[in-house]
């Protein structure tokens, strides 16, 4: 079994760096990377610029471009969507996503398994760039409570009022998908059709999972501890109701990344599990 997992991981590693389509010019050019390098832990301007982030055309509430990066074969049978900084005050989540872009784009190119990675390293730029950084977006909405789970109109407000006691950091918004950032991610799910979604958060130091398949028992030093589902959450919507496995990584610190070696170990563990447990499109 270990041999097969190792082989599968090797296939995914190599596939991440297979020839990819030409990329448009980077979104906002150097100013965006200057802002990210100044705000994020363990992120330099060269690391950000090397990520070759692309303007998706979508905008946040305040008009900031929502950027992404595609790596791998466009016609791959396996598609993985990775998102970071859904909560703007979880700075390390965006940093890890950028480091993983570097790892995904820097592997050998001589293995056949095609994988298409789509990274959205900063889903909530308004929250991230606010002073101080904010969990919510510029409308004060918790994006991870704004996805259209069944009975959202009934359950999400009740959960917010009764369970969180109207915590403003967890306001689900007026309606599902009321926010441009959550609509953007929802559109990515519909158009990209990922077989796996990886959401990077902080600071609880655990690994969560929703949806079909056998969850990973650990990624690096993070062990599986399924914390339950919430109305409007990405895990609830994508994993439970759309049938797309959602791995939620809760880093142990929102303001500091793991060591580079630990980020790489988490990445390799993710690849091994994906190779063993996430089927792509039929060949």
Q: What residue ranges belong to the model's regions?
A:
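Glycine-rich N-terminal segment of FAD-binding domains in flavoprotein oxidoreductases
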Residues: 84
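A short loop-to-beta-strand scaffold at the N-terminal edge of the catalytic core in hydrolase folds
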Residues: 62-70
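A short acidic-Thr-Gly-centered motif at the start of a beta-strand
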Residues: 71-76
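N-terminal cap/lid segment of alpha/beta-hydrolase-fold proteins
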Residues: 48-62
């Amino acid at each position: 079994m270990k041999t097969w997992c190792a082989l599968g991981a090797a296939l995914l590693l190599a596939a991440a760096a297979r020839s990819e389509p030409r990329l448009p010019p980077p979104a906002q050019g150097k100013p965006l990377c200057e802002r990210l390098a100044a705000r994020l832990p363990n992120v330099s301007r060269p690391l950000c610029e090397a990520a070759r982030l692309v303007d998706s055309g979508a905008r946040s509430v305040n008009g900031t471009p929502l950027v992404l990066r595609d790596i791998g074969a466009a016609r791959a049978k396996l598609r993985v969507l990775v998102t970071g900084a859904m909560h703007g005050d979880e700075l390390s989540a965006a940093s890890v996503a950028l480091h993983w872009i570097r790892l995904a784009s820097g592997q050998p190119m001589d293995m056949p398994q095609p994988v298409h990675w789509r990274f959205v390293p900063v889903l909530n730029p308004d929250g991230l760039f606010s002073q101080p950084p904010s969990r919510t977006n510029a409308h004060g909405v918790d994006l991870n409570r704004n996805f259209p789970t069944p009975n959202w109109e009934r359950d999400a407000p009740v959960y917010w009022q009764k369970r969180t006691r109207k915590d403003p950091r967890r306001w689900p918004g007026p309606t599902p998908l009321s926010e441009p950032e959550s609509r953007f991610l929802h559109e990515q799910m519909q158009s990209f059709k990922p077989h796996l979604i990886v959401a990077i958060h902080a600071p609880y130091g655990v690994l969560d999972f929703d949806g079909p398949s056998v969850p990973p028992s650990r990624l690096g030093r993070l062990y599986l501890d399924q914390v339950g589902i919430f109305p409007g959450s990405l895990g609830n919507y994508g994993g439970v109701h759309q049938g797309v496995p959602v791995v939620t990584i809760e880093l142990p610190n929102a303001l500091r990344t793991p060591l580079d070696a630990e980020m790489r170990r988490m990445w390799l563990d993710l690849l091994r599990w994906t190779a063993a447990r996430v089927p792509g499109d039929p060949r």
